[in-house]
């Protein structure tokens, strides 16, 4: 009986420890060891408290706000500004009259003369574009 009480008093050795079993199962399945670590109390005391941290964030949010409302005129200038115009580099001279014209386009002065000529001489159904 004394042997039984000694065995009952001594801590029983577990054959199955669930925490170590699942940790080894996790490392076998994913190949990544389980991250179980304790943070020392000294490190926790060095961290700033949450209210002071929130105050710092709130101060940054308040400073990010414009001081005055954007005026109607400034909004319109910004919206209606449009994009910068590109320089026209493909210009050449018209072979008939010698005025400047865009490449692969009809000369505006020659086109006006052609339209006037067609209007004076019977106005056929042909149109010059």
Curated annotation (Swiss-Prot):
Residues 1-63 form a transit peptide. SUPFAM superfamilies: Zn-binding ribosomal proteins. MRPL32 precursor is processed by the m-AAA protease (composed of YTA12/RCA1 and YTA10/AFG3), which cleaves the N-terminal transit peptide. Cleavage by the m-AAA protease takes place prior to assembly into the large subunit, an essential step for mitochondrial ribosome (mitoribosome) assembly. Proper processing by the m-AAA protease is dependent on the zinc-binding region within the tightly folded C-terminal domain of MRPL32: zinc-dependent folding halts degradation initiated from the N-terminus and triggers the release of mature MRPL32. It holds the Pfam family Ribosomal_L32p. One of its GO terms (biological process) is translation. GO terms for molecular function: metal ion binding; structural constituent of ribosome. It is found in: Mitochondrion. Zn(2+) binds at residues 94, 97, 107, 110. InterPro entries: Mitoribosomal_protein_bL32, Ribosomal_bL32, Ribosomal_zn-bd. Keywords: Metal-binding, Mitochondrion, Ribonucleoprotein, Ribosomal protein, Transit peptide, Zinc. GO terms for cellular component: mitochondrial large ribosomal subunit. Belongs to the bacterial ribosomal protein bL32 family. Component of the mitochondrial large ribosomal subunit (mt-LSU). Mature N.crassa 74S mitochondrial ribosomes consist of a small (37S) and a large (54S) subunit. The 37S small subunit contains a 16S ribosomal RNA (16S mt-rRNA) and 32 different proteins. The 54S large subunit contains a 23S rRNA (23S mt-rRNA) and 42 different proteins. bL32m has a zinc binding site. Component of the mitochondrial ribosome (mitoribosome), a dedicated translation machinery responsible for the synthesis of mitochondrial genome-encoded proteins, including at least some of the essential transmembrane subunits of the mitochondrial respiratory chain. The mitoribosomes are attached to the mitochondrial inner membrane and translation products are cotranslationally integrated into the membrane. This is Large ribosomal subunit protein bL32m. It comes from Neurospora crassa (strain ATCC 24698 / 74-OR23-1A / CBS 708.71 / DSM 1257 / FGSC 987). The lineage of its organism: Eukaryota, Fungi, Dikarya, Ascomycota, Pezizomycotina. The gene is mrpl32.
């Amino acid at each position: 009986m004394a042997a039984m009480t000694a065995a009952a008093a001594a801590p029983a050795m577990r054959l199955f420890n669930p925490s170590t079993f699942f940790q080894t199962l996790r490392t076998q399945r994913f190949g990544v060891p389980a991250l179980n670590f304790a943070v020392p109390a000294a490190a926790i005391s060095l961290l700033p408290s949450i209210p002071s941290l929130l105050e710092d964030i709130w101060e940054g949010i308040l400073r990010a706000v414009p001081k005055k409302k954007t005026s109607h005129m400034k909004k319109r200038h910004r919206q209606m500004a449009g994009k910068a115009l590109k320089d026209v580099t493909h210009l050449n001279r018209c072979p008939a009259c010698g005025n400047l014209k865009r490449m692969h386009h009809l000369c505006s002065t020659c086109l006006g003369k052609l339209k006037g000529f067609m209007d004076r001489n019977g106005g056929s159904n042909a149109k010059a574009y």
